[in-house]
Amino acid sequence: MSIDTDFLTSVEVKEDELHGNVLIAVTQIALGRTIGVIDKATPNDSNALLILNLIKEADDGEDANICMRQEDRKTFLQTSKIINIGERLLLQRLSEEECDEEDQDDLENLILLKDEDRPDSTQSCTKSSSEDSNLNGFEEYIREHGELVPGQTPPDGSHKCGVCPKSFSSASGLKQHSHIHCSLKPFRCHLCPKSYTQFSNLCRHRRVHSDGWTCPTCQSQMPSQAALTKHRPVCEMTALYKPLMAQLAGLSGAGGLGSVPYWPHILQMATQAPHFPLAFLAANPEAYKLMQQTTCASPDAECSSGHASESSPTTTEPVDLTATPKPPSTSEMETTSKSDDGEDRDSIGDSGNDDDDDSEAGVLDESSTTTSTKKRPTSHTISDILAAPQLGAQALNSTFLGMLQRSLNYNPAVPSPHSFLRAMSGAKASSSPSSSSGSGKDRYTCKFCQKVFPRSANLTRHLRTHTGEQPYKCQYCERSFSISSNLQRHVRNIHNKPNTSLTPHNHHRQRSLHNSTSTSTTTTTVHHPLLHLPGTSVPVPKV
């Protein structure tokens, strides 16, 4: 049997609700084109028979485009008209009388295959006589009774593979197996150029075009479930390192730290914070100058020389920025001493001196007034500064926000200039949508290979594979281990063998090792029972 390979590339298998699996033309097929020849005298390919069996016979009122004609022991199939794209292939059986009425010369040109188109005999598979008889019986059944109805059982003895010696108990098993030997893929997807040898694989592929496999994090379409499983850990790990803007999105109601893009506004906010470190400005004079320029440039800000008289010239004096502890004022000391004296007099008894009580109350009022006037006035809160229009109008600098995420290596004696930012963000960290990384197992990620571990202990042990650290050293030899269990196994199998001879020298060595490791929680040294009995001692020879 031979089948035209160009014809196979011009058709595809589709599922029809009324007719089941049918052949549809994907390219235009010319008139008089020979599709295939079935010859009983030569071995025939069962895969080709299954493909040709998909050509349904035309019903009454339907126009057939494929004609089938039989001559001697050969059956020829050819196109009887031009088949357009999307047209279903329909078969018409011609009797010998109808064939005789036609021009024999034209039929020979349209039906007979050329010698160069016929398959090489060396490519055909050699089969036994029983296989030939079974296959010929299948061909005879198709020729006499027509196509197989879905669910119809072929005749007995026809479920054997024509290429290999395998046999099957059902026609569906033989049909599914036959695609293994066929290099062609008749089941093609109508949305993409992919094709498959089995219809079940095509049905599974159609899920990509219907719902598909979508990543819930980045909404990306994956071609298969395996690709989605491989993509999700990488995508979820990338989501942990989003910019600071996404982490502070929940703070937009209170002014939002996301609207603070540049250093001048950061310094302006910092100076109005209650615990801003003056030592930072003393060590960074350029930052102080930049802060002063920004404060004077803003229309609502008040400069130090703004309240001066217009007639008197403004003079700039150097400001002492050294952070020195402020001594307590005399009024506060007097208030404290007088309050203590008043408590002593009240403990002795009521002396009836109302004037002293009034004088003490007056001193307290004066001291509290003096203390309140000496405090630095704060006219704006941090939330008001963050909500300023000039701060929200500027663009976000992702580089600066990334720098805020990293820990700055400042002197421990000097407080960090960004401590107030961390304090504010920590106050509402629970309201931030990205403050929690989803599940606890995604928090510990290796910085070398990006692996994720559920516990910090697992990550610490994994990091030693990259750094080569071996903190667990053997007490007997010079070997070191990265895992404590490996050290314990080494000591148990190498140094503490059960057949070791017990000598006074070994007793002395084990006792000294026991004293040196008595504070540890895990003891890997094996001791002799005499060392643990009260009142017993092992004689140790003098060296």
Curated annotation (Swiss-Prot):
What domain of life does the native source organism fall in?
Answer: Eukaryota
- Bias class Basic and acidic residues marks the residues at 335-348
Enumerate the residue ranges of region (Positive regulatory (PR) domain). 2-62
Give the keywords, sorted.
Developmental protein, Metal-binding, Neurogenesis, Nucleus, Repeat, Transcription, Zinc, Zinc-finger
Which effects follow disruption of this gene? RNAi-mediated knockdown causes defects in anchor cell (AC) and ventral uterine (VU) precursor cell specification and AC invasion in the larval L3 and L4 stages. RNAi-mediated knockdown on a lin-12 mutant background reverses the AC-deficient phenotype. RNAi-mediated knockdown reduces expression of zmp-1, cdh-3 and him-4 in the AC. RNAi-mediated knockdown reduces expression of fos-1a in the anchor cell (AC) approximately three-fold. RNAi-mediated knockdown causes defects in vulval morphogenesis.
Instruction: Provide a GO CC annotation, any one.
Output: nucleus
The biased composition feature labelled Polar residues covers 306-317
Q: Residue ranges under compositional bias (Low complexity)?
A: 513-533
> What is the stated purpose of this protein?
Probable transcription factor, required for migration of the hermaphrodite-specific motor neurons (HSNs) from the tail to the gonad primordium during HSN cell differentiation. Required for phasmid neuron development. Required to specify the pi-cell fate of ventral uterine precursor cell (VU) cells.
Q: What is this protein called?
A: Zinc finger protein egl-43
Organism name: Caenorhabditis elegans
